[in-house]
Amino acid sequence: MTTTALIIAAAIAQSTLLPAPPATQRQTVIEHATVHTAVAGQAALVDAFVVMQGDQVVSVGQGTPTAIDGQPIAADALRIDGTGRHVTPAFISSATTLGLIEVQAVRATDDTSEFGPFHPEVSAWIAVNPDSNLFPVARLGGVLLAWVFPQGGQVCGESSLVRLNGWTNEQMTVVPDAGTFIQWPATEPAPAWYASTSAKEQEKQRVKALRRFDDFFDKAAAAIRARTADPSLPLDARFNRLADVLAGERPLLIAAASAGQIESAVLWARQRNLRPVIVGGQGAEAVADLLVQHQVPVIVLGTLQLPRFAHQPYDEAYTLPARLVARGIRVAIACGDEPSNDRNIAQHAAMAAAFGMPREEALAAITRVPAELSGAADRYGTIAAGRSATLLIHSADPFEVTTSVTAAWIDGSPVQLESHQSLLRDKYERKYQGNDGASRGTTQVRPEQPAAVTAPAARPGVQSR
């Protein structure tokens, strides 16, 4: 690639929008809204309020707020009428590469993978691009937090939870070490006509891959024990990074997409006293008893998918979260798609809700549960007093495809809900407003929530179809 092409690619990958300003101590009161707190066991609150101050939620309840801890609401508080609107915690995009890649066809913008099969010392947050042009698009879809997974190899590296606001990746990082991500080898051969190896050869490769896992984790445990006994020994960054995982203090995130993969991965992890989390989930229902026995959560990679096999029903992916929840398994929902589509996370949860998953459970699958699994539940994922003021106001039911996010806050800071696409929309709406060209070029401000979007009038001399 030429130097000119690299410069153009780098320029395209930069967002021109500024990060949100720091939170102020002025109170913000959202009134008369339907509030979905995502707190376990709590239904949606109708005609409810949320009071924010600084970077925290200070009060949540029903009715009209008059005082907080005996102190009246400040006279200068910003009051927002939420009539007909819904308030939810910010959505969390799980198992994503958002911020690690910009344009898939431009390798210079791709920082998803490292060379080699084993690199647990790699941390996703270090490679996150704070100027990514995909962040504003994701924020418009309600995604204010991303659980970023590195890719490549068998032990891919350390995942990180980041907020989609900040000048630097250090400012954006919430949980730098949120679990080590590994790719579990396939357990069932693929006897398809396009397979490049025979079933017997695939079995040999599987055994070889499992042996590599055993050897690597055995060496890591031995190195950690040796250095604990004698701190003067040289530090191996790869093995040292697994210390918390081997101690069961951080989760081991295992990519597995079949019943055989999930079963072997869980048994292997529990034999080593690790905390497995399954990433993928296809086939999980077949081994649900094992997952319940060992309390293993599942991150389902997308519901807007076709069945993998011809014998499966059309709604196999749609109903998977509901079937797992019914068996007592904790479920998070991810897009399972390229990061430019993370904006659609609510529709993945909505599909699960439409096919049997309780609505509040579906909301929790993209808010509370990812926060719990990534180690940030003390601040994010729910709306409650003392939690971070990281939340959304929706124009209507958040699971309706016609609903839009009308306001958002990250740690109490109001978020600019604009993207390159929305700016172009506004530009051409202004261009074609009115029945003649007299109003073109005006600087009319777009209303926050238009009553309706109508087709632009035909230009003079142009026949409408």
What residues fall within each predicted segment?
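Sec-dependent signal peptide recognition
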Residues: 1-10
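Extracellular/periplasmic ectodomains of large secreted or surface enzymes and adhesion receptors
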Residues: 14-15, 25, 326, 407-465
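Acidic, glycine-enriched loop/beta-strand segments at the rims
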Residues: 17-22, 35-49, 61-62, 67-69, ...
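Divalent metal-coordination and catalytic microenvironments
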Residues: 33, 50, 55, 84, ...
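Active-site core of metal-dependent hydrolases
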Residues: 39, 124, 149, 227-317, ...
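His/Asp/Glu-enriched, well-ordered alpha-helical/loop segment
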Residues: 109-113, 121-122, 251, 292, ...
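Polyanionic/metal-chelating signatures
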Residues: 134, 139-276, 404, 410, ...
